[in-house]
């Protein structure tokens, strides 16, 4: 899916969480498709059947209706090998050819961790054997469960060796962190295309959630933006989008392969950041 076509710009959306009817997401996809992203990825929950079905349904809708390739997120932390095989068969049935293979977040109450998968690399190997194009996640500030950047680099290298064709990174608010991580990847012999994950800050609560969930750090520029605009939602969002656009411009200038925009299902964010990517 990642061809030699210059700077890659892709979008991420999430499906309806508890509703088998995907119609509510169609207007969003209609709008995003006009931005001509290189692909649109669709998230899924950790083991939720409805979410997995909706991921497949939205990917099929993208495939059938737009000139854009879909990428289905695929987690394994609560899955048996049979469940993985069944979900892959469903994706094949719907003509989906691209998958982002993830271990997945630790499950909520009521779901148990599968003993059949410990690492994403195991899932990647299985999916690759079924003739899918596989993307892997990577973590410029290390995975929150790992904490060691050298170990994270080694895990990422193993994912590529298992069959991942390209890498999509977790968000970071620091371009320097992205570039340092990419340099370490290349020095470790990992030459797969790298897409930097970009998410603009929209609120203080959102930033706090990202720190808690992902362990991201806050560069001084972000701290100053939050301090200046935390009492004005509109101005904070505007400043957050401008900052994200400046990140994209820096990364593009420094030769990063591309960016992956976490749209949060907000078309105006996707539009602003795609414009920065295409300049």
Task: Name the predicted role of every residue range.
Residues 16, 37-58, 104-115, 165-180, ...:
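Glycine-rich, proline-tolerant flexible connector loops at the mouths of alpha/beta enzymes
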Residues 12, 40, 91, 159, ...:
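Conserved, mostly hydrophobic/aromatic
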Residues 20, 115-139, 187-241, 246, ...:
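Active-site pocket-lining/capping segments in soluble small-molecule metabolic enzymes
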Residues 13-16, 43-47, 73-79, 104-106, ...:
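Active-site beta-loop-alpha junctions enriched in small/polar residues
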Residues 1-42:
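Conserved N-terminal beta1-alpha1 strand-loop-helix module at the mouth
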Residues 22-31, 49-66:
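Glycine-rich, positively charged N-terminal anion/phosphate-binding segment
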